[in-house]
Amino acid sequence: MFGSSRGGVRGGQDQFSWEDVKTDKQRENYLGNSLMAPVGRWQKGRDLTWYAKGRANSAGLSREQELAAVRQAEQEALMAALGYKNVKKQPTGLSKEDFVEVCKREGGDPEKGVDRLLGLGSSSGSVGRVALSREDKEAAKLGLSVFTHHRVESSRPGTSLALAKKKLRSEEKVEPGPESHRKSRKEKKKKRHKKEKRKKEKDRGRRLDSSLAPAPIQHDSDSSTCCKKRRHDSD
């Protein structure tokens, strides 16, 4: 009367079979039912435990091989660091001819002394070259990315030259070299010399003016006394 409402066997292992689970209503509640009690058509005639076979032996061998390879690499690196072994250089995949062509493409003009690089989307027929500033050159040497796209106005042909000249002037102003320092010193010396000359000329002019100016009239004391006596006599 007070029996369990659930079906199935709750006894030992000898009373349980997966064949009974296939027809059970609660089949999906059994753990591992998809492998031990398969029902679908795609599961018939297939090895459902293929991923777990031949794994124990291969795992040990691969682990040992991996450790041996790591030890060998560490030993080679140590020997190369101590100088007992030459470091193997990896091939770049470029032949001498290809290297010469790349150098010709990326070479700068000898007149302007500016390095040039190929822009993105350029081909061998129409090569788009962009002038690099000194800061961009230093960044390229360090391996940093360089922005090579610049705005171009096709309607005015002379604008590109004007922009390039402005950039060169701004670079020269920002990064003055030893020649510019010398020029500025010379200009300062010239200005000082001119100021000193002007001061000397002004001093000379003042001295000449003071020497040429008429002396003030000085009345003698005798003449003044005589005039006073005459006035007294007339009175």
Curated annotation (Swiss-Prot):
Residues 106-115, 169-181 have a biased composition (Basic and acidic residues). This is Multiple myeloma tumor-associated protein 2 homolog. The gene is MMTAG2. InterPro entries: MMTA2_N, MMTAG2-like. Keywords: Isopeptide bond, Phosphoprotein, Ubl conjugation. Residues 1-11 have a biased composition (Gly residues). Residues 182-201 have a biased composition (Basic residues). Residues 116-129 have a biased composition (Low complexity). Residues 1-21, 106-129, 147-235 are annotated as: Disordered. There is a cross-link at residues 22, 104, 112 (Glycyl lysine isopeptide (Lys-Gly) (interchain with G-Cter in SUMO2)). The keyword Ubl conjugation applies. The modification Phosphoserine is found at residues 122, 126. It comes from Bos taurus (Bovine). PANTHER family: MULTIPLE MYELOMA TUMOR-ASSOCIATED PROTEIN 2 (PTHR14580:SF0), MULTIPLE MYELOMA TUMOR-ASSOCIATED PROTEIN 2 FAMILY MEMBER (PTHR14580).
